[in-house]
Design a protein with these regions (language model features):
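Charged, cofactor-coupling segments
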Residues: 17, 27, 237, 241-256
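A short hydrophobic beta-strand segment most commonly corresponding to one strand
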Residues: 101-118, 245-256
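A short glycine-rich, His/Asp/Glu-containing loop-to-beta-strand
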Residues: 11-44, 137-187
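Glycine- and acidic-residue-biased ligand/ion/polar-headgroup-sensing regions
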Residues: 45-71, 163-164, 175-227, 239
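Short, structured patches in soluble enzyme cores that scaffold and shape functional sites
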Residues: 91, 99, 106-111, 143-146, ...
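Conserved metal-binding segment of the jelly-roll/cupin
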Residues: 80-100, 109, 222-243
């Protein structure tokens, strides 16, 4: 198995539920961090040379300060419950956020152009149903080229796949092959749900396929709740949700 697969708990630190810097991944741009307010009620981060997206996963009424400017994130009870509001964080900003319980994600990208801080309410997040048949899934466009242009490098979206369906289809890549001019690193963070629950559940499993043209990597991983997978290059897909166990994944992408 490649070292691209990061099982749940393997990226935990004293400060983070998940801490995945560009250096940890052996690449240049994408960072992925999650924080649990049950561990600590307030966190402070300085985004030196980075821009970011602050996105509640399973927390509500989060107080946020971005370079002294105050915001409140309404959040959500869990990723399967609803779309959440979020905040774009400028390059070089100092960010503090506090809450009583639950988890929040900070997605980052190495960047140099500075854009203003921006709060986006949940009702303004562009939600689309993509695919058909067993490839039907919901995409929440957080910071994508069609939904948010006031950023430099970062791209963030959420995908919810009903139990028994698949997503990341057809298999695709972002490494400047003919017909695709972009180069993007990509992080997948998964939660495996259970019918009728707002949260991930340790009972279910899903599956994820990744392969490279030179066949140095060709693997299908059995996914458990809160697993992470980094994709520096190569084809990825499908992501398969087992019957009765819907799948959520959060993507962050960035590149030159």
């Amino acid at each position: 198995m490649s070292n691209w697969y990061k099982p749940a708990g393997s990226l935990k630190t004293s400060e983070h539920e998940i801490s995945l810097s560009p250096q940890d991944s052996g690449w240049e741009y994408c960072g992925f961090y999650t924080y649990n307010f049950a561990t600590k009620s307030e966190f402070t981060v300085e985004l030196n040379g980075r821009e970011g997206v602050l996105l509640p996963l399973s927390t509500q009424n989060v107080s946020v300060s971005v370079d002294g400017q105050a915001f409140t994130l309404k959040g959500r009870t869990g990723v399967f419950a609803a779309v959440s509001d979020w905040i774009y964080l400028p390059v070089g900003s100092k960010v503090s956020f506090s809450g009583k319980s639950g988890e929040i994600a900070l997605l980052t990208a190495q960047a140099s152009e500075k854009f203003p801080v921006c709060y986006t309410p949940a009702e303004q997040v562009q939600v689309e149903v993509r695919g058909s048949g067993k490839a039907t899934r919901q995409v929440n466009n957080i910071a994508t080229p069609t939904s948010f242009t006031q950023c430099h490098k970062i791209l963030v979206c959420e995908v919810l796949t009903p139990g028994g369906n698949l997503s990341s289809w057809p298999p695709h890549r972002h490494d400047k092959f003919p017909g695709c001019p972009t180069i993007n690193e990509e992080v997948y963070y998964f939660q495996i749900g259970k019918e009728g629950s707002d949260h991930g559940d340790p009972e279910g499993v899903g599956f994820f396929h990744v392969y490279t043209v030179d066949e140095t990597v060709d693997e299908t991983v059995t996914l458990h709740d809160r697993d992470t997978y980094v994709v520096p290059h190569g084809y990825h897909g499908p992501s398969i949700a087992s019957p009765e166990y819907p799948m959520y994944f959060l993507n962050v992408m960035a590149g030159p």
